[in-house]
Amino acid sequence: MRKLFRYLKGYELQALLAPLFKMLEACFELFVPLVVASIIDTGIKNADSVFIWQRCGLLVLLAVIGMACSLTAQYFSARAALGFGTALRRDLFRHIDTLSYSELDGIGTPTLVTRMTSDINQVQSGLNLTLRLLMRCPFIVLGALIMAFTISPRLTLLFLLATAAISLIVWCIMRATLPVYHAAQNSLDRVTLLTRENYVGARVVRAFARQTQELDAFVQTNDRLKAIQWKAGRISALMNPLTYLVVNLTVIALLLSGGREVYTGTLTQGEVIALINYMSQILINLLRIADLVISVTRALASGVRVSEILNTPTTMADPAAAGLEPVAGSPAAAFDHVTFTYRGAGGPSLTDVSFAARPGETVGVIGGTGSGKTTLVDLVARFYDAGSGAVRLFGHDIRDYSFAQLRRMIGIVPQQAVLFTGTIRDNMQWAAPNATDDEIWAALEIAQAADFVRGKPGMLDAEVETAGRNFSGGQRQRLTIARALVPQPQILILDDSASALDFATDAALRAALKEKTRGMTVFLVSQRAASVQRADHILVLDDGQLVGDAPHADLLRDCPVYREICLSQFSREEVAKTL
């Protein structure tokens, strides 16, 4: 948690000036009861209107100066807190971007969103209050006690007892609420998760008529969050009644004891009023300390959660090495007895997989659901590191490549087509910011997307809405394929990225890829046998094991798993025609 304070770098002056101006304001506030006492004991007692007006003018002056100091302090504290939050948010985003898929899978997207938004906002708010109140409130409490002592040392004992009682109440309540606030933030993660799942999967929920069940699950989770927050609220609600009870009892004791001392001439009426005002100042500032502690408690809990992410080391360090040159005659991609297990999984997703893909080859990857197809190409792209064995690209261990060089070498089209807000040109230039229109149109032609892009108003400047929702599923897939083709990578991975295309468009896409990407190694992942049958060789996966690695005809003859896949999609006569 202490490491977070480094994000105040550059705002040290503001962080110093904010509490100093608040303490200056507090000094003026401590003089107010003495001025009021002088008005009562001198001005009112002697019916001296001039004196009264002078002292009232002094009160106004103290108020104006105090307000100016307060506004200045708030300006500095807000600037420091905003700078802190901005720097922390930037570094957290940058750190999350370095985490491997393994860490991201373990943490979860909803948790990361909550850390980035709600938790950082809590820390920022807590810092803002701390800069303004951490020194001011204790200073006023201590100052009020000293000022009261100068008026009546005996009655100051009542102040000390009241202050101790209120402090004990605040401490007990804070101790009880700290774990509750932490539990509330964890419960908020769950609410965020359910909300995201239902918004992203809204069509699936409706297709299976699961609205009622999902609503019930959300209501239960939301009610659990409400119950935790209600518990924290009930505990916190005890603070004001208990503290005001202590203060009111103290004021009664002050009036009784002070009245006797006024009667005996030990104290004046103005001094009794000053003591009561100092008691009020102590109460107000102890309550502010309580609010500060609540805010700091939440901020600390949130800060710990943010620190957990910042302290999560990536298991995939970037070697940041100089560009590696291909080893002559080496495969574009090769697996050497690779085994991989996802974090928390009961067994490996890939087991002892070995193969080689030569430069310029089209490699089909096929298998049933859960057979490990996506896992295999994720290892080629180094989204994960192999648990054992080695993955090599162009003769070098994949871990020796810098991420920058690796991303230039590999173009990836994921299963879920993702487009970003902007224009078609903006999306096409993601991997190649300096790509020309001719290069973009060439990629669109290969991806079978040029015709519908030309039909859009503005063509390459046509707007892309959030998540590409103004395009059909097939159009989104073709645009993401084109985006991967624009930088002309050495290796292209198509991870079941033509599932929304009709057979004619799919066939045209495969033909264009084979004709116009010569020299490019293409991994074509699909559950359609028709999509991979013309590949140079096909990797057949079954429950994480490589059970076939050969051209289509050889696999039909020698691989029962591949033959079963083909016969499940075509008749025997149709299969025979493919030979």
Question: What spans do the regions from the language model cover?
Answer:
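Alpha-helical segments in transporter systems
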Residues: 5, 13-34, 55, 59, ...
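Transmembrane helix-loop-helix hairpins at lipid-water interfaces of multipass membrane proteins
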Residues: 9, 15-72, 76, 149-154, ...
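Transmembrane helices of ABC transporter permease
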Residues: 10, 14-27, 128-183, 256-267, ...
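An intracellular "coupling" helix at the cytosolic face of ABC transporter transmembrane type-1 domains
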Residues: 10-13, 98-102, 118-127, 131, ...
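Helix-loop-helix
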Residues: 47-51, 147-161, 231-305, 309-310
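Helix-loop junctions and hydrophobic alpha-helical segments within the transmembrane domains
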Residues: 92, 96, 205, 306, ...
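Conserved catalytic Walker-motif region of ABC-type ATPase nucleotide-binding domains
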Residues: 96, 218, 306, 335-337
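ABC-type nucleotide-binding domain
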Residues: 326-579
